[in-house]
């Protein structure tokens, strides 16, 4: 399999390249309430403000490889839900428009099997092996982290990263 540097701070778009990476929006950014974020604890402050929730499908050479669910605290991100994310880098939008840069974080990696939702997005059989990465991404803004759950079809691509 070819390597994809998703396990880094740079983000998927910069690791793969904008030319071969496409992004389809499954659920447009919307504000919802939240009590937890993929198993990561939230502060009372984070819970009270709600989050911006979105789902994206990332394709490499038109093949679905990542199904990404993102939850971002709804705090000082004006017009975020009205932005276009189709074929755009989330990290770049956060950096350019909100002066937020990912500085580190925590990730949990687990092997699972494809459920109906994954079958629909990846076009694989039910039970197909899938890698799930739950991430808490810390930023340069003190006390501001956001969260993602990424389902990875590693059949043709492996995940790589330096540590």
Give residue ranges: language-model regions:
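Residue-level recognition of beta-strand microenvironments
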Residues: 28-30, 57, 136
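Anionic-ligand binding region
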Residues: 51, 56-61, 70-75
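Hydrophobic residues on conserved beta-strands that form the core of alpha/beta folds
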Residues: 25, 53-54, 67, 132-133, ...
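A short alpha-helix capping/helix-coil boundary motif
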Residues: 68-71, 95
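C-terminal regulatory/effector modules of DNA-binding transcriptional regulators
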Residues: 47, 60-63, 75-76, 82-84, ...
């Amino acid at each position: 399999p070819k390597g994809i540097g998703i396990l880094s701070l740079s983000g998927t778009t910069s690791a793969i390249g904008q030319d071969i990476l496409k992004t389809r929006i499954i659920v447009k950014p919307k504000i919802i309430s939240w009590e937890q974020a993929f198993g990561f604890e939230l502060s009372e402050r984070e819970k009270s403000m709600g989050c911006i929730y979105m789902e994206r499908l990332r394709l490499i050479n038109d093949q679905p490889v990542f199904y990404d669910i993102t939850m971002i605290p709804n705090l000082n991100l004006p017009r975020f839900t009205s932005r276009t994310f189709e074929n755009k880098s989330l990290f770049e939008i956060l950096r350019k428009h909100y002066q937020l840069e990912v500085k580190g974080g925590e990730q949990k990696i687990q092997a699972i099997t494809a459920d109906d939702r994954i079958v629909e997005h990846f076009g694989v059989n039910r039970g197909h092996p899938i890698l799930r990465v739950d991430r808490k991404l810390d930023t340069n803004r003190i006390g501001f982290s956001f969260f993602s759950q990424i389902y990875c079809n590693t059949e043709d691509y492996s995940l790589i990263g330096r540590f």
